[in-house]
Amino acid sequence: MKKLLLIIFLAFTSTGFCQLKSKSFEEVDSLQYFQKKKIIVFIHTDWCQFCQRMKITTFKNKEIMEKLNSNFYFIDFNAELKRDILFNNQTFKYKPSGNNVGVHELALELGTINNQIVYPVLCVLNDKNEIILQYNNYLSPKDFKLLLEKLEQ
């Protein structure tokens, strides 16, 4: 019985050591002064099924978590967040569009492709906070790893 409990404990703790470290926009603004890195912003909503799927598959992949933690600044951004965000010397606000419905201005700024926003959105910024890539679709762990490899070059 003790061996079984030990095995279960080790199984849970060995996978728990690697966690994806998400930053805020404000943190990244400050961190860029000390170490320049590309910023990967995952723009999602709570109701988006593909967004939730990426959270439990792509962003739980150990290799992906390690690459994101060491080579990039990662921001997990809910497009329906209702607080103001100061980023790149500009304040972005939540824009209500009905009863308990709306979208954050920063999500629109970073996630709009061809005049529309479709979730999930992956937005990559260079170290000067300029958009270098936008992608609005589900990315499997395999495809996301390929993207990270290209971004690391």
Question: Which ranges hold each PLM region?
Answer:
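Thioredoxin-like thiol-disulfide oxidoreductase module
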Residues: 63-64, 73-121, 125-131, 151
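C-type cytochrome heme c attachment motif
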Residues: 46-53, 121-123
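N-terminal leader/targeting and pre-domain segments
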Residues: 19-35
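Loop/turn elements at helix/coil->beta-strand transitions in domains of secreted/extracellular proteins
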Residues: 35-39, 70-73, 127
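Short active-site neighborhood of thiol/selenol oxidoreductases, capturing the structured segment around
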Residues: 34-49
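Bacterial Sec-dependent N-terminal signal peptides
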Residues: 1-21
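Typically the conserved alpha-helix immediately C-terminal to a functionally engaged Cys/Sec
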Residues: 52-67
